């Protein structure tokens, strides 16, 4: 393991969707000569702009961003892919004398970057396709029979992790939880300042509702319509994410727009709650109130970088 003094210093900014991570990250980057490394699993996809709440064109112009718009919607992107790409981006940023700020709410990606990945078998696309039409509740039920520990941590909407856990068990006869227990998750590959934004729950839910309404005003329905017209099917991981799957169902005549919006708000709130739970279990996190005292936050960052 590298000596602490020789490790690259990396700032990680996490928190639930709608907490203001992107805004804070841009402000910090401008102050410290930073560049942002995206750690949101959906913002890597081109054409998925409104529903993923990508940084605005103005913010992208203010500060360099990495790992945004790097894939087409029909391409797979795993935690392993993220770790490889983010590691390369951070090395490039450091080489140019800048500071990397990793920003996002996909906890699995952040953990993969900092601690590495569980040594489990590589993916099997053919095997995964067998689960494509299985409802989330049924995936969770099946997983609970063979890996109750992992099942207890997952939600029926978390199809990617449910399918991956079933895939690993099918391939090896061992639950993912067994592989996880063999990984200490203690060898941090960077010198890290981990920060996360804490928002009172009702305030967060209020922000989420407003954010969803703004997505509709900004053209989310048309964005999904164009994706479908371009040949990207509802079975794709990207179009099964929150916001896209509900609007796809609306466009297919399976629900009204009001019903779709209600589901988007509900599922986004549930996702934000799971994100808060995940970050709450992480060690050594510096919790922020934002909007709050930017000067205090900046001071903490500068002290870390000194």
From Swiss-Prot:
Record field: catalytic activity: adenosine(37) in tRNA + dimethylallyl diphosphate = N(6)-dimethylallyladenosine(37) in tRNA + diphosphate
Region (Interaction with substrate tRNA): 40-43
Originating organism: Citrifermentans bemidjiense (strain ATCC BAA-1014 / DSM 16622 / JCM 12645 / Bem)
Keyword tRNA processing belongs to the record: yes
Known role: Catalyzes the transfer of a dimethylallyl group onto the adenine at position 37 in tRNAs that read codons beginning with uridine, leading to the formation of N6-(dimethylallyl)adenosine (i(6)A).
NCBIfam families listed in its UniProt record: miaA (TIGR00174)
Lineage: Bacteria, Pseudomonadati, Thermodesulfobacteriota, Desulfuromonadia, Geobacterales
Cofactors: Mg(2+)
Top-level class of the enzyme under EC nomenclature: transferase
One GO MF term: tRNA dimethylallyltransferase activity
Site feature Interaction with substrate tRNA, where: 106
Assembly and binders: Monomer.
Protein name per the record: tRNA dimethylallyltransferase 1
EC number: 2.5.1.75
Keyword terms, alphabetized: ATP-binding, Magnesium, Nucleotide-binding, Transferase, tRNA processing
Matches recorded under Gene3D superfamilies: 1.10.20.140, P-loop containing nucleotide triphosphate hydrolases
